[in-house]
Amino acid sequence: MEEIKKIPSRDQIPAEDKWAIEDLYPTDEAWEAELAALAESQKTLASFAGRLGESGETLYAYMEVFEQVNAKGDLLGSYCMRRADEDTRNATYQAMAGKFMGVAVALNAACSFDTPEIMAISDEKLAQFYAECPKLERYRRYLTNLRRRKAHTLSAAEEKLLASAGEMSQAPDTIYGS
């Protein structure tokens, strides 16, 4: 009869076989500080509401902030999710993952206006934006792909409601860990 192998604990695994999670954030405290800064980004994102159709410069400025917030969110999410995956019994990292999800949902709600506003910009006006703000070209592909879904886009209020439900939609994964 085969002997059942016991799964080694994390401290028994050689360093070269583990994620180099400290490359993302050296400590949990550094992660917490960065998460707090990310949460503050809600205000900056929300300050663009109702203004994306004003000019190419405004749209470009929003896209820059949006991209930076998403990049920072990717790092924060990777860190806490990898930490939570190390040992799913560790309540500290499960709580960090939950905290991150709360901030991510709030950020999604804060920028839920962007898709409807970008959709409302006419093709002619967007062409003018590209002409007056050449830096906006960097986001042409993203904006083009976004605008292709125009027929399937909700109003700003509906998008915000949907974005706010994000945490609730994660419940099955949180409960069952799948």
Predicted regions and their residues:
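A well-structured
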Residues: M1-S178
